[in-house]
Amino acid sequence: ADGRLLVKAPKGWRQYTFRGGGESVAVQIDLPTGSRVHGNGGMAGLRSTGRLGECRFKTGLGEIRLDEAGPVELKTGMGDIAVGRAVDHADLSTGSGALTVDRIDGTGVIKNSNGDSLIGEVTGDLRVNAANGRISVDRADAAVTARTANGDIRLGEVAHGAVVAETGFGKLDLAIRDGVPAWLDLTTGCGSVHSDLDDAERPQPGEDAVEVRGRSGFGEIRIRRAPHHVRATSAGATP
């Protein structure tokens, strides 16, 4: 009624065990393009094809895969999250699993306790926090904060604003867009620091500039110019 569809599944005791023979419910729904989807479950997954509007989904155990939606708020205690395109804002969290987003047209907040976090292109401010796993961002057009306790951090192209990259154990590979001046503040507890950037004059008011703060407790740091051809082609691309 009122343009809403509510789906509920019975909570049988067998569905909460990891042993075979448990009960399960599979639901397939055809929705108009741009529909809103809200849901939660103890053990449930979500797979969407096509374009959704606002999508909020939370599960204790299960994978979440969307082609396109926005804004999105997705959380799983254990399982992968994969999004083709997020619009407006993306708030994504997994306790254990791979987290990939091809493109965020807007801002993003990413949390991953155990697993890699791989982002293609993001147009707004981005924050990524991880406990165990590498962080990779192909291209960022605004500020980036990327922190992991254990894992490498790769930023394929940054172009504007404050960039913070911190890892307790791992390498930093940060590339600045060609022609954009950058201020560098780089420290590693054990390892080398390399910068391929030439000295540049102070930018004029209103001119794009990047302020980079890089920290590694154990690992090398490399700063370079991004190749002209860099574009977000795959969130899973390795450096």
Where are these regions (language model features)?
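Intrinsically disordered, low-complexity terminal regions
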Residues: 1-239
